Amino acid sequence: KALFFDIDGTLLSEVTKTVPESAKKAISIARSLGHLVYINTGRSYGEIGQVRDIAEVDGWLCGCGTYAESEGRTILNRLMPVEQVQRIARLAVDCDADIFLEGPGVCYYCSKSGRMPFGQQLRKNFGNTIEWLEPEAVCGEVNKFCLLTDEQSDRVGLFRNLDLDIAVIDRGEGFYECVPEGFTKATAIDVILEAY
């Protein structure tokens, strides 16, 4: 009775950056037959503003399982402690890596040099982003974060000193998605299934 779809590369074409009408129609039909339809994405809730109207759905599962909303109600919102976020952001900047902190309301981008092209692209793609903060100035809600590194970054120092309760997913080309240990997209699915 519950269907879960990813955004990037599943509903949203990576080529056209649009959702095919056939997918919108299929979602509508599924809902009319009584099925619950959810978007389950690695993006944080603060990053989905530009895609919230792709189709009418029952809820959003975001941030690699750290946030779940169903029928307009937040039923999971795993936040990282502010002190931990500030410490990790400082570590990233000191190791010459860019860090993109993702939360339910807003995203933060901290960078020593701003030289990473992918970081520039992330800032453009995800509308509600506060840029170029000093790590200690980050004071909002954060569910997860991404690290962007290159040959000038101190990756060894960065990962040696990263908190042990953070799961690091290597996405390739110096891009790392980092989530509180124990959270995956399946975590949010389980929360929805338990609620219904």
Residue ranges and their predicted role:
Residues 10-11, 67-68, 173-175:
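A short, flexible beta-alpha/helix-coil linker loop
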Residues 6, 63, 148:
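Conserved residues at the C-terminal ends of beta-strands
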Residues 17-18, 39, 79, 148, ...:
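Residue-level marker of alpha-helix boundaries and capping positions
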Residues 11, 15, 77, 177-181:
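Pocket-edge positions in alpha/beta enzyme catalytic cores
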Residues 1-16, 88:
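Asp-based phosphoryl-transfer active-site loop
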Residues 21-116:
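Active-site phosphate-binding/coordination module
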Residues 95-98, 102-196:
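Conserved acidic, metal-coordinating active-site core of Asp-based
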